[in-house]
Amino acid sequence: FSAIKRTYHYYVHRDKDPFLRMYSCELHYDLDFALMNEAAQYLLQVSDFGAFCKSHTDVKTTLCDVTEAKWVQVSDHAWYFVISANRFLRNMVRAVVGTLIEVGRHRMTLEQFRDVVAGKNRSDAGESMPGHALFLERVEYAPESMQYNINEGL
């Protein structure tokens, strides 16, 4: 638990592609990625992510420090969401992505998105996206936690 930063990517694509279907979520609708990125930037301003925590868990705190949240276009039909934080709640990334997709489909306004986050109620947020498209991309540790002592081992 000595990691100071974790980065996840969640992959989505539009066209049928047998090579992507195991690693990316296929979507059948247009999305407004500019609006989704605007909503994602709001995540950098908040610290309580109770709205995106799996229901009925005994987590001690829903506080997280999100330092990066944005959609990146890979091609004309593929994107990924990148999010970095000091810690994540169970199901948090998939719930964030599902809620951002509601924004991108114009089913939720930016103001409603902010209200969902502020309300800290999981039932107000969007659906959790499937897990097969979520990948842990990077974990960073404090330099002092990685010091090797020859007498103690790692």
For the regions a protein language model found, what residue spans apply to each?
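Structured-RNA-binding interfaces characteristic of tRNA pseudouridine synthases
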Residues: 1-154
